[in-house]
């Protein structure tokens, strides 16, 4: 029998975390949004408020629904505040050692029957589950960015994930109004296994001088009908995240076709991470984005 999920914890108040809190609260779940940084919590709550206000202005949700959703979210700086959650979703930086540390500390305070999930975009669910005291109640729930707008959620079972956890997680995602894509536990799952090598190839195309930033993005938008060019999309995702996923693919599948482009590595080393640092393949510090190469 699938567990009943009523209260959801979200670890990390950044772009993914506040997005998950937003859709969960709007769907009627009580939410505890956790972050060790008070500033990030404040910023995350402000983002949720702003995004809900935008949905009201577009008549996607009512003012009443917005007010109720905000009333369901509690901001918390301590993991102890997640103790009675039925499901906790981790959205920390895409570094395995960071996630494992969070899970170790979380499981020390979380009720035994609760489900633990990771929003990881590439890391093995089986390995992450091994850092917990409940591998059978551990699962990957990978949302797409931006969470309030994107309809797909990847659901990934680890080797020990039991049927009750899978069914409860699947039901939770359905209540959010999202479509489930079930993926096996292989590096980067489905979406990023396909998407990130394309982005990496676009970066190689720039690195090798085949085309400049504008030409590459225009080629894919106008020639392949993509809504965003691959370099623009890389900046949106975050170049550090792109690099982490390519490294997981390269190490996990041992195939040279997944080798991260040296230019991607150089940008990350320079701290040019895309939109979040105002510089990446585009410079966002002016009135409109300008290609950096």
From Swiss-Prot:
Regions crossing the membrane: none
Pathway: Lipid metabolism; butanoate metabolism
Gene Ontology terms for molecular function: 3-hydroxybutyryl-CoA dehydrogenase activity; NAD+ binding; oxidoreductase activity
Site annotation Important for catalytic activity: residues: 142
Keyword Nucleotide-binding: no
Classification via InterPro entries: 3-OHacyl-CoA_DH, 3-OHacyl-CoA_DH_CS, 3-OHacyl-CoA_DH_NAD-bd, 3HC_DH_C, 6-PGluconate_DH-like_C_sf, 6PGD_dom2, NAD(P)-bd_dom_sf
Key word Hydrolase present: no
Source species, domain of life: Bacteria
Listed EC numbers: 1.1.1.157
GO BP term (any one): butyrate metabolic process
Keywords: Fatty acid metabolism, Lipid metabolism, NADP, Oxidoreductase
Entry-linked PROSITE patterns: 3HCDH
Catalysis performed (reactions): (3S)-3-hydroxybutanoyl-CoA + NADP(+) = acetoacetyl-CoA + NADPH + H(+)
Pfam families, per the entry: 3HCDH, 3HCDH_N
Family (UniProt): Belongs to the 3-hydroxyacyl-CoA dehydrogenase family.
NCBIfam families: PRK05808.1, PRK07530.1
Protein name per Swiss-Prot or TrEMBL: 3-hydroxybutyryl-CoA dehydrogenase
Organism from which the protein derives: Bradyrhizobium diazoefficiens (strain JCM 10833 / BCRC 13528 / IAM 13628 / NBRC 14792 / USDA 110)
GN (gene name): hbdA
